Amino acid sequence: MSADIVRELQTAIRTGKVVLGYRRTLRELVNDRAKLVVVAKNAPSHIIKELKYYASLSQTPILVFEGSSRELGAACRKPFMVSALAILDPGESNILHMVQGGG
């Protein structure tokens, strides 16, 4: 996973609004509040499939994080695993532009 994506993810968490976890991410997708969804590569396939489905309905970009849920948790500076997260407000981060523009 690109160090730039990790840095921008940390900036979004610090300066914007981000929800962690599959259930909260799904809730934000269903309510059309998520601007970007990030899911760990090793998340269970049914979770990835469901998040991709709801992301397509709300036309929300989804990024499959190239690391494990443990690595995604570490990238978020959390002492626990994170299978999915939703960015509601990127704050000072450029992560939305990086994902939409391909980095």
Residue ranges of model-derived segments:
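Small/polar loops that bind or transfer phosphate-bearing groups
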Residues: 39-40, 64, 87
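Acidic, metal-coordinating catalytic cores used for nucleic-acid/nucleotide bond scission
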Residues: 41-45
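N-terminal first-folded block
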Residues: 1-39
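Solvent-exposed alpha-helical segments within well-ordered globular domains of core cellular machineries
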Residues: 7, 27, 31, 49-53, ...
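C-terminal structural segments of small proteins and small subunits
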Residues: 70-103
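Signal for well-folded cores of large energy- and translation-related assemblies
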Residues: 10-14, 30, 56, 77, ...
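Charged, alpha-helix-enriched surfaces in structured cytosolic catalytic cores
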Residues: 4, 46, 50, 67, ...
